[in-house]
Curated annotation (Swiss-Prot):
Presence of the UniProt keyword Transport in the record: yes
Organism field: Pseudomonas aeruginosa (strain UCBPP-PA14)
GO BP: any one term: dipeptide transport
Protein family per UniProt: Belongs to the bacterial solute-binding protein 5 family.
InterPro entries noted in UniProt: Peptide/Ni-bd, SBP_5, SBP_5_CS, SBP_5_dom
Gene3D superfamilies: Dipeptide-binding Protein, Domain 1, Dipeptide-binding Protein, Domain 3, Periplasmic binding protein-like II
Domain of life: Bacteria
GO CC annotation: ATP-binding cassette (ABC) transporter complex; outer membrane-bounded periplasmic space
Protein name: Di/tripeptide-binding protein 1
Quaternary structure note: The complex is composed of two ATP-binding proteins (DppD and DppF), two transmembrane proteins (DppB and DppC) and a solute-binding protein (DppA1). Five orthologous SBPs (DppA1-A5) are present in P.aeruginosa, which increases the substrate specificity of the DppBCDF transporter.
Protein function: Part of the ABC transporter DppABCDF involved in the uptake of various di/tripeptides. Prefers dipeptides with acidic residues at the C-terminal end. Involved in the uptake of phaseolotoxin, a toxic tripeptide inhibiting the enzyme ornithine carbamoyltransferase.
Alphabetic keyword roster: Peptide transport, Protein transport, Signal, Transport
PROSITE patterns attached to this UniProt entry: SBP_BACTERIAL_5 (PS01040)
Amino acid sequence: MRRNAVIRSAIMPSLLGAALVAAVPQAFASNLIFCSEGSPAGFDPAQYTTGTDFDAAAETVFNRLTQFERGGTKVLPGLAESWDVSDDGKTYTFHLRKGVKFHSTDYFKPTREFNADDVLFTFERMLDKDHPFRKAYPTEFPYFTDMGLDKNIARIEKLDEHTVKFTLNEVDAAFIQNLAMPFPSIQSAEYAAQLLKQGKASDINQKPIGTGPFVFSRYQKDAQIRFKGNKDYWKPDEVKVDNLIFAINTDASVRAQKLKAGECQITLNPRPADLDALKKDPNLNLPSQAGFNLGYIAYNVTHKPFDKLEVRQALDMAVNKQAIIDAVYQGAGQLASNGMPPTQWSYDETIKDAPYDPAKARELLKKAGVAEGTEITLWAMPVQRPYNPNAKLMAEMLQNDWAKIGIKAKIVTYEWGEYIKRAKGGEHDAMLIGWSGDNGDPDNWLGTLYGCDAVDGNNFSKWCDAGYDKLVKDAKRTTDQGKRTELYKQAQHILKEQVPITPIAHSTVYQPMRKTVHDFRISPFGLNSFYEVSVGK
């Protein structure tokens, strides 16, 4: 039996020292206003996959069994104080923290503290399709299934009020890291029982209850989310503001102006065109770091003509990536050629792009029997993301590139939550999307985004290659990093050869904030956490 209290992920060291804006905090202000980029689809982290949703719930309202250190990738104890791992790597026994209180609100008054029943409810709801709560409120859990946890967790047992044992079918080298991600945020079993009794199970997604540093107060879509500092938080020194407010605006330029005017203290995803003005403002800080991210085009291989490799190859080599980098990222992006960033361990540096060659692309389309003037849809995100600061402009440039080879792309967009929902349903032909790493493990890219288990979730290409999938799953089932690297490199070559995606760029992440903000740290995972953050004069 191996005893663990803290483990370290094997991500490149360059990400471990994430950017920090800090000084000795001054007198704390009552309000911290965050100019956020979009409305969350809901407040139940298990249902979602985007940073917008996670910022609004997982990073505010909830905790998990394990957690990542602020601004880094090291895994620390969370609601579990410690854990034991069996010698065969298939059994994890978690020793739960005592004295942790769930939020008390006008819609729920807890009668007990956090215990093993809450862990069981959180995971059994995702595991069991016949779970009473899931039957009352049917929903999907994309991360849980995309990562194969629905198949790999054999059982969860309550050993006592503060001890829980997970038994896996296979070794999962990233299991502890996975539990620190947003999706397995611990829910209150008592609150769930109340909702079932009231016939309001869906309220778990609209009126969240957690153990986190901030208590949900109210939400007005496309306007604001309000939270109160949790005065009963189990780490009271980490709550340094009375009120946390998300001021929602999808326009990056408007967010920048609000920041400059002092209408908010922190924002995110600035337009590259606004960076110079933000840098020159004496009232602002503009910390940055290399993004652990990827912006890419996903081709839906279940739609014709994308089911043909030659078509995907043609579209890929017709993309003028350098022009996109220059116009869209404006010096804040690096060309991408692989399905994950170069700072991820196991990245294969031998993988190169096919040369930009519109003439050859035309030949490939002709060979595939694709007629001149064939129409397709190209979906563009309505919001700025860390990996794509201007999806509209990128889509217009791709539209122009593909027109040169006889493909007419119609640009389509939806509100962010609807965009993701429809894309998971496979309505798109090609789409702009991207990813910020979640846990420092290669499986979070190669399995979560391109694996067969993820075709109904984050695998927006709907691509499922048996050979590729076996390599990725075999890599996850061993803790030998050398063997894992070898398997992942083989998988990366298959991914490149089959072209379910066109990687575009890895961006530099900027986090503008006023100089009155103290101790905010940029997350390598593209999330925004506000515990331990204060606002001075």
